Every structure is written in structure tokens, then in C-alpha cells.
Amino acid sequence: ADKAASGVLTKLPQKQIQEMKEAFSMIDVDRDGFVNKDDLKAISEQLGRTPDDKELTAMLKEAPGPLNFTMFLSIFSDKLSGTDTEETLRNAFAMFDELDTKKLNIEYIKDLLENMGDNFTKDEMRMTFKEAPVTGGKFDYVKFTAMIKGSGEEEA
């Protein structure tokens, strides 16, 4: 597995590896070089979620062993290459949708994008949400993922 995982390092652009390193560092709250259940719980709580033990275990099961940076890169490299399925994108938004309304406050989403991870600029934000389905300040992520993935399905 390590051989396959280290091959990821040669496939990804240096900038992307650096961004992933920053993301990993944010998630590795206790700074031990591995992401564990406590790290996932802490980062989730910082994002306003309180996942239960079962959810945290499911997240960690994606890795075939301890989740160090190389394994983290390996797992997420496919996602970085733009191969996320519509369902994967929808599930990513759903993590922030505790009431399961299929809609999120647009200001909350913009705040996340401006202040975490990629740090979107105002221009990037405008382009991203130019055609986004927003009604009454609520961002419809089901319609949005259908739009960007081209399925044409408006309902899940």
C-alpha cells in the first residue's frame, strides 16, 4: 500500500501536495502525524458538527491502516483529480446540513470557502456562485451538485 501511496506524490502538482499538507495539519489536531477519531471529532466540532462515534469510525475506515499524510494523500488524490461523483459532492455539503434540509445558508458557505482550505478570493466566490441555486439566502446544494456534474437531476 505504501508503494501505491507514494506514487501519488509523483502524480500531484507540488501546489496541490502543499494544500493537502495544510488540510492534513488542520485535521491532525493533536499533531502526532496521524488522523484519529479524536482529531476528526475536534475538526468536526470546529465546523459546527458533532458526529457520533459510528460516523467517525466510518470516516476512518476509508483508510486501510493508520491515516498518516501519505495515506491521506492517496485517499484524496482521486477526489482532487475531479472524479468526485455527484453523490460525493452532495455528501460533502450534507456534512454541514444538520437538519437535512438540502439547503445551507449561503453566507455560511461563503465564509467557509473564504476562511478555510482554499481561501477563495471575492472573484472566485462570485464565479462559483454566479449561477448557483440560491433562494432567500439558502443555497440548494442538491441542485448545485446536479448542475456542476451535469446530471440534470434537480432532486436527489
UniProtKB/Swiss-Prot annotation:
One of its GO terms (molecular function) is calcium ion binding. The modification Blocked amino end (Ala) is found at A1. Gene3D superfamilies: EF-hand (1.10.238.10). The keyword Secreted does not apply. Ca(2+) binds at D28, D30, D32, D39. GO terms for cellular component: myosin complex. The keyword Acetylation does not apply. Signal peptide: none annotated. Keywords: Calcium, Metal-binding, Motor protein, Muscle protein, Myosin, Repeat. Residues 15-50, 84-119 form the EF-hand domain. In molluscan muscle, calcium regulation is associated with myosin rather than with actin. Muscle myosin contains two types of light chains: the catalytic light chain, essential for ATPase activity, and the regulatory light chain, a calcium-binding protein responsible for Ca(2+) dependent binding and Ca(2+) dependent Mg-ATPase activity. This chain binds calcium. This is Myosin regulatory light chain, striated adductor muscle. It comes from Mizuhopecten yessoensis (Japanese scallop).
